[in-house]
């Protein structure tokens, strides 16, 4: 089975937490609009090594574009690739950041070929890939399987918004054929006094580090 870690970040406030509040992203428990996932303190723990260093960063699923601004502000030397199934989301976000280090392209996470073809635009050697797209377990499984060749050794995949109601065995069964590709795999159940995700109950991550 896939191990699980629970992190309560109520007493841990980071720069990324505040940036999440500033840009109104639901990744921060201090977001003032809509859902409040307690991810930003955990992300600081996982990503701080890249804050002042070059990073090749991919996010799948950008919706209104709050996280596009967040990552551009946090990673000072980042090269970014953002994907979504909605061209309007991509066009809107592209207006808010530099075209020099940001690439936007369509991707349909329900189709393996679309995932592969879109990721080919990155040139591979991805340091960190974050999925915030459909939150569908089948699609999340497709993403993990298809992104492996594009992730560098030691690179990280983070799947956001795993349903706490979904049996963890579901993910183990989907990933057991590629489990050997990773040096670390774990769920992270994220807790915070401000946690708020009514109707979803999906404050949970799946983190995978490639061998």
Regions found by a protein language model. Give the residues of each.
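A short alpha-helical cap/connector motif
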Residues: 1-130, 134-159, 163-211
